Amino acid sequence: MCDIDLKTCEKSSKYKKKDIVDLGKKCGVDPYLPNGREKTRQVICTEIVNQYSTNPPSSSSESDDDEDMGKQDQDPICGISEKECNKLDNVNLLALGEYCGVDIYTPEGNLKTSKTICKSVSLKQSSPKAQKSPNKNDLINMDPANLKKLAKKLDIDWKKKDIKELQYLIAKKLNSIKSVSPSRSPSPRRSRSPSPNIQNMKKKELKALAKALGASDKKLDKMDKNQLIEYILSRKKSPSPVRKSRSPSLRQRSRSPGRSRSNSPVRPKYRAADLLGKKVVELKELAKMEGLKKWKDKTPSKMLKQDLVDFLLHVGGGGQLPKTPSPVKPSASPKTRAELALLKVPELKAMALSYGLKNFKDKTPSQLRKNDFIDFIILSTQKSQSPPPSIRSKPRSSSPKYKTKDLVTTDESDGEIVVKKITRKPKSPRRSPPASVRRSRTPSVPKSPSARPRSKSPSVRAEITDDEGETPPSSVRPKSPSVRPKSPSVRPRSKSPSVRPKSPSARPRSKSPSVRSKSPSVRPKSPSVRPKSPSVRPRSKSPSVRPKSPSVRPPPPDPSNSPSITVDPSVTPPSSVKIKKRPELPEYKGGNADRDLEILARRRGYKVIPVKGDGNCLFRAVGKSLRLNQNIKYSHEDLRAQVVTYLTSHKEFLEPYLEYVTESGDTTPQEYAKNVERYIKNISKPGTWGDFICLRVLSEILKVKFNLLILNTRNFQVISNNDTFKPLIPLGFIDDYHYTALTPLYAEPIAVLENETPTPSIAPSIRPPPSIIPSIAPSVRPSIAPSVRPSIVPATPSIVPSLKPSVVPKLTPSIAPKIPPPVFGPVKPLSSTRELLEEADKVHPYVREDISQLARAEEQILVSLGM
């Protein structure tokens, strides 16, 4: 049967796989692989045919010993042909290479190809067998050349030695080798394929190996290749489990009865890599099967995964504990909430117990749930991280709040000071633009000459009127109020309270408590009182209390009187001269910028049209203003595209703005060209903030001027590329980061000069003031007839005065004076009672001023009449 044909054995339906396995056993072929699995039918048939072809039945009289020696010399498994070896699958191929003692790994640690492994197997099988070691007679009969070769193989120094010495040294060396070497050569199946060198492995493979040994992903990301190698070497890997024997027949054949072996050490039951790849629940079940009750003073419920692995390795390894790192106590902040949520409840419970958990939320550890354990762990880590409590300063006492408005008058003066109710408003969050955008968007506006340096101890100022006679809103309440009058000179403030002498024109103040209004950014620590001066200085940043004047809404200013900024694109500054950067706008210190701009625009006769702040606000504001004021429709995409097209075809337009276009500071032509392209590319992207260069380009394209109302300076500024352009497009500008559209409140705006005269301290009434001259009859008949004497006039004295007036007063004819009709602007509809009360509060002090002026005029009329 062993002389079966290969084709019949492989493909005949007469024989099943079981029959082929039995046939292989009968013919002396092992049908099992080293791992215990059966070989494929094709491999078994090939080995049977090869076995029969190499050892055919012989009729010659050969001894049984010679047959046995021939069988031992020829290995049927390793004698497989390369063609048949290449057809094997990966599992059988690896088993074949390991069985035949062939290196299946490259020096870099990678697996060799199937073709390379098969070639190595065939070469090893076809290599000549090792000869017997020469005996003493062979050494005597050996020629000197062969003696030298043999000495060289045995690492014997053969130089300067004669033949007898070489024979003696070789014989001595061979005897020592025979005494150390085992009595028989090891079986081929005992040779193990060398493991890949860890130094030659790639970082990706090292990470996978370290992860299998229990390293976390977070730890692996921070480790380089050398640290990975150190970590893998520090984790002592347990040896592989016992390999299954190929077959019972081979097992019996390998153990000869006459030869005794030394007892090999017991191999461990568990491998560290296998245990670390299992879950905690599976490890606990294995530990219970091994009889776990307590380990390292911990019960199974308190043990972590590493404790369970150490226990199983200790039990299965014959009492030898591998060098695995002990469980580290959690640090101050071991894991985040998300990482803790990935852990199992037993692990969380063990971690919480390590932090000293006894009772949490009136529950014992056995009653707590997963979220409770996570809360306790995070709370414990926060306590360990929290610094010692610091001494906190007590909050400042708030200043008194005034619920109503009162009038404070002086002893000798008829002037009145308004006490304003101060309410704290939260600051509206404002986005701060990037430095590059902030620099490029700032219009060239110099700082106001009236800006005063801030002192360390600011005191209260009298409220200073701007060119509209109104006070800008603010958001900070003063701590201790005081009154500071108007003064044209700028004086540094002192750190201590001081009282300054009154000017000759100032009237004495009463000793009643003074109140000031809000300060925009700081709280005064010490009050100071200053006299009132008749002159009025320009508005400063710190508003204070002042006598209010009637709210007369001035019309928008005449753009012809405003300074326009004209740029000639043909003028190019020399490349050697570096242009100085223009000053930044003064920082806005108000509370709500949008609300303040609405108030400022309403005083100037404009209405604010909100614009979406998405980076396209400049183009959106220009488009809205064109549609509302000039009835021209443009979308913000169209305007941006026109700017990009114009700058692409007129790159010389950007030459006057080298400092804003050049980012690197280099003004060479090559660098300038790169920066121009970069600037145009950035502006072409939707959402990129526009700047004043875009405004000038739009002015040139649309042939218009832009009247920019800047909140920081509270003034208009005309931006244009040519003074000859007539249409004026109003825009609002907030704190160097946002543009809005404006539309006039009046149908025909009245031109007003930019340099407006200061608002008088006593606002004009709708009636003309009376012209009063003593001893001359008034031109206007008094409201009380002379025949009816008022109660405030004393009776006529009984003694006739000796002096008589030179001009006898006469009654004025009953002709009504010609009073011009009042002019009222458009009335804004009120939406709530609150707005009505606010308007009434604004008018109230002015009405009282008018009444007091009328009372004084009446008194002077009576005095002039001698009454």
Curated annotation (Swiss-Prot):
It is an enzyme of class 3 (hydrolase). SUPFAM superfamilies: Cysteine proteinases. It catalyses: Thiol-dependent hydrolysis of ester, thioester, amide, peptide and isopeptide bonds formed by the C-terminal Gly of ubiquitin (a 76-residue protein attached to proteins as an intracellular targeting signal). Keywords: DNA-binding, Hydrolase, Protease, Repeat, Thiol protease, Ubl conjugation pathway, Viral genome packaging, Viral release from host cell. Pfam families: OTU. Residues 606-745 form the OTU domain. GO terms for molecular function: cysteine-type deubiquitinase activity; DNA binding. Residues 49-73, 177-204, 231-271, 379-591 are annotated as: Disordered. Residues 234-258, 421-430 have a biased composition (Basic residues). Residues 582-591 have a biased composition (Basic and acidic residues). Gene3D superfamilies: 3.90.70.80. The active site is at residues 614, 617, 738. GO terms for biological process: DNA-templated transcription termination; protein deubiquitination; proteolysis. Its EC number is 3.4.19.12. Residues 433-462, 472-551 have a biased composition (Low complexity). The keyword Protease applies. Transmembrane segments: none annotated. Hydrolase that can remove conjugated ubiquitin from proteins and may therefore play an important regulatory role at the level of protein turnover by preventing degradation. May be involved in TIV genomic DNA packaging in a manner related to the Gag polyproteins of the mammalian viruses. This is Putative ubiquitin thioesterase L96. It comes from Tipula iridescent virus.
